[in-house]
């Protein structure tokens, strides 16, 4: 079989049609850009590299070779925060900041180990003259008991009359219960008097 060599122009034209290109410059343009990159693309790459080193949380891992080619113009765009001097408190033209700081540092009792300073102010507890501890004397309790005894005796006598009509055994049982309750009441009264007035307890025989 005979092999016929096609001319170069026909081959280039057919390749351009297959690639969808109309000019030869469009096919050669990517190759030229790969060999001679544009200055704008270089600046964009340099800007991305600097951002990958400056912005925290960037996906790019730190590379020491890239640090050497950092663009130092970024430092001008993002300057470091400068420390501002402390504002001075002035009172009639006199600077009192230094004096206050010295007083706080000298007073060790008002400074903690972590550097937090406090001002100790004496606390005055409010005194209410109307609120006073209630004290009951034993004389007032005795007078109350004396006033209560007559009606109690009257009720006891009436109850005794009613019980006597029912039977002697029931009367004796009721009197015993009344005596036990009376002794219990006297012991309770003696305990209250001892707590309030700190006196010796009443001995009940």
Curated annotation (Swiss-Prot):
The record's GO CC annotations read: virion component
- What is the name of the protein in this document? Protein I
UniProt-listed InterPro entries? Corona_nucI, N2-like_embe-CoV
- What this chain does, per the record? Structural protein that is not essential for the viral replication either in tissue culture or in its natural host.
Question: Subcellular localization, per the record?
Answer: Virion
Q: Gene behind this chain?
A: N
Which family is this sequence assigned to?
Answer: Belongs to the coronavirus I protein family.
Misc: The gene encoding this protein is included within the N gene (alternative ORF). Isolate N2 belongs to genotype B.
């Amino acid at each position: 079989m005979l092999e016929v060599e096609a001319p170069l122009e026909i081959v280039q034209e057919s390749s351009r049609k297959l690639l969808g290109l109309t000019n030869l410059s469009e096919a050669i343009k990517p190759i030229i850009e790969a060999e001679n990159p544009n200055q704008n693309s270089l600046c964009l790459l340099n800007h991305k590299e600097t951002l990958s080193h400056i912005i925290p949380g960037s996906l790019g891992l730190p590379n020491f070779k890239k640090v050497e080619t950092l663009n130092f113009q970024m430092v001008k765009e993002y300057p470091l925060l400068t420390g501002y001097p402390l504002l001075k408190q002035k009172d009639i033209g006199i600077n009192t900041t230094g004096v206050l700081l010295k007083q706080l540092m000298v007073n060790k009792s008002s400074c903690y180990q972590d550097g937090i300073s406090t001002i100790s102010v004496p606390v005055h507890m409010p005194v209410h003259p109307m609120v006073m501890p209630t004290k009951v004397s034993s004389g007032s309790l005795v007078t109350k008991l004396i006033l209560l005894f007559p009606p109690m005796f009257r009720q006891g006598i009436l109850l005794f009359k009613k019980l006597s009509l029912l039977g002697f055994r029931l009367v004796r049982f009721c009197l015993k219960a009344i005596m036990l309750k009376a002794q219990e009441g006297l012991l309770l009264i003696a305990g209250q008097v001892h707590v309030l007035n700190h006196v010796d307890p009443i001995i009940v025989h």
